[in-house]
Amino acid sequence: MLPLGPKKALLEYTLFSSELLERKVYVDAISDFLKNYPTGGYEVLEEEEGKIPMTCYRFDLKNSPTLLHIGTAGGWTKPSTGYTFQRINKKTKELVDFLKQNKPLHKFGKRDRFWFYDLLFIDVLAKDNGSGADLFRRMFEKNAPKTIFNFLDEKSSFQEEFQIMRSFNIKQFLRALLKRIF
């Protein structure tokens, strides 16, 4: 929930799922949340819905020497959060520099440690979808906002990343890592 004023807020419901669910499932989840929230009633002013591919799928493998998929179709959405705007800005700047080098387009982009962090995070959520709220809650409770946003914007230092990782139940992530390795 994001407050927009003293009596107005944006409520977003996010669900990690390999399948789309009926609209009623999402509406019921929001209604259940609001029933337990001490608001004294509410009025829905606007609704929207969307589907964001929160995945570590290798979109880059669909590129060719002369074709480069960009934006969400190019895998530029951050897998663990669904945020796209900041990453498109960053990737666009990188792409401009890359194009100046006259290299084949399929050589653009790379998987880095942040891709790997997202991969493990998505694996943890896929195994236990209900843990998402707790993971984010722990991260925000145990870290300074600047550290969190550096991490989410993929600008963090290893020290900040270690601090973020200490927020979580490390066993969940070790299991995900071991499953990837073996």
Stretches with model-predicted labels:
Residues M1-G5, L67-L68, P104-G109:
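Short hydrophobic/aromatic-rich motifs at helix boundaries and adjacent loops
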Residues G5-K7, D32-G41, K100-K103:
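Secondary-structure boundary elements
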Residues K93-F182:
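C-terminal helical "tail/cap" subdomain of flavin- and related membrane-associated enzymes
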Residues A9, H69-A73, D112-F116:
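Short acidic (Asp/Glu) and glycine-rich catalytic loops that position anionic groups and cofactors
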Residues S17-E94:
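FAD/FMN-dependent oxidoreductases across multiple families
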Residues M1-Y26:
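Conserved FAD-binding catalytic core of PHBH/FMO-like flavoproteins
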